[in-house]
Amino acid sequence: MKNLYKYIFAAMLTLTTATSCSDFLDESPKGVIDEDKAFSRPDEMVTSAYAMLGDCWYSYPFNLWPYGDLSSDDCLKGGSGTTDTGYHPMEIWSTMTSTSGEFDELWYRLYCAVSRCNRALLSLEQYGNTKLGEETCKQRIAEVKFLRAHFYFKLSTMIRQVPWIDENVVKNKLQEQTRNDEFTYEQLFDKIIADFKEAYDVLPEVQKDKNRANKIAAASYLAKCYLTLAYGDGYEATNGYDHINKEYMQKVVEYTNVVKNSPNYGYLEDYGDIFLPEEKNSKESIFAVQTSDYKNDNTTFGRANWSNVLNGVWGMWSCGWDFHKPSQDLVSAFKTKNGLPEFDDYNKTIDYPVNGKPNAQTWDPRLFHTVGMPTFPYKYEPEYTLTKANSRTPNTYGYYCSMKEVPQRSKGETYNGSWHAFAMNDYVIRYTDVMLMRAEALIETDNLAEARSIINDIRQRAKNSVDKHIAYAENQCDIALYPESYFQNKETARKCLRWERRLELAMENGRYFDLRRWGIASKTLNAYFANEQKDVYDGQTYATYLKDAHYTAGKNEFYPIPYNQLYYVPGLYKQNKNY
């Protein structure tokens, strides 16, 4: 694992410059290292492709938090106000346009990553067998195809119709002839699936370098692809559930079964441990973007998580800019009655816990691992108790803050540079996410009993996650397992599954994509906009700007193709519908 870190840093210092992005359609190494010399070292070209996993910045976060969380009912933008960064349209939708600089930069950087993968594949094709040996070369090709599929999954789930540019397109110099509508949505996913399938067929379950892609990561991603496709073309359906593809759901069951049966992955015993840096490569982590602390990795600066650099607590960190703020709607979703969610009544009253002052309202324990709240210790450390002063603009974004992506304050900042950041891995896929995908597919393939068993296993872990980290909230927590009566029909089982995904994966950057997959984004978000702007915390109103928010079905399911990309290749790309 240390060797892979070493090569990634070398790739950053050399190949990042050598293959700087001049144009995502035709990226060529130049500058620090001679092109032929760099290209003739296939294993380092592979490492340079891995380096792109973390080659992000707050204006183009590869974990997609502005596009998967901010755009949902789980969080508000945060910062100094609505004009702080260009992410405000993502939280109100009504002002979404193709001219966003953030859209354009993210598209550009993701295609730089695709280009890096294509360059590595061409290097492996030419030099791999002779320099690495046939078996190692075969594995490296599979790893790079996994990485390329990973980047394309992000592009296609965000923007839908994107140009497919692989190593053959590059080799034949067809980049400037490649349209974005050459393939349908499903055909594009077929290509992504083919890359993941090659990784699944070739790679071992365990790699010598722990951070490389492996068979289980590929199986997890294949399940995610088929789950996405099972619901149709990505736009909201109007015919109930008849459109759900049972064959694809069965594929989800099959691939998640591979993950379930692996002895190398499983649930961590305490939910809170998942989000501590010392557990970042635990059995819960199937694939993650790796980071490191400069004090421990023998580098000058370290490898920081730049996607989340804005999300620290105001007044607690030098990089605490107070972005990614949990919504009241999310906090209310953690309410319980007799240990079970208040599905229909959770948002009827505005409630929030106060440390040391329990009342009749009880909460799922995962709230206290997910949302930082005034009067409570921040991430389990009483010496760093949150106050109202730790919110930057409470009259706009309220008093809650996110906890999962930020380390405990006592750990300090872990990037040695003019900007400060954290060495917290970004989960791409974690074990519980895969098991919830499995439960979702089991419900749709009529195995409600096993789905209930999976969900109850996850709830049992949450029930057991009080004493170690959040004993101060013990008398405010209550969570129970679902009785059989909740899984007698698909309608109620779906409600339990969807609620569980929200609570378990809250603030992990995927809520919007769940809502879209289920075809309930417009109904859920427009109701949320109406309710959230009325919320009050201890007399303070906030989020009144949501009066201007509106989500339009048939348009907003996908983000627009950036205007600059349409301009650069006139007539080659078609805009998503209704933009």
Model regions: which residues?
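Bacterial Sec-dependent N-terminal signal peptides
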Residues: 1-30
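Membrane-proximal, proline-rich intrinsically disordered regions
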Residues: 21-71, 562-579
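Conserved, well-structured interaction surfaces
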Residues: 39, 45-55, 81-159, 175-190, ...
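Long, intrinsically disordered, low-complexity segments
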Residues: 42, 75, 110-113, 185, ...
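Short coil/turn linking the two alpha-helices of tandem helical-hairpin repeats
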Residues: 156-157, 163, 207, 228-237, ...
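Glycine-rich, aromatic-lined ligand/substrate-binding cores of catalytic
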Residues: 283, 289-392
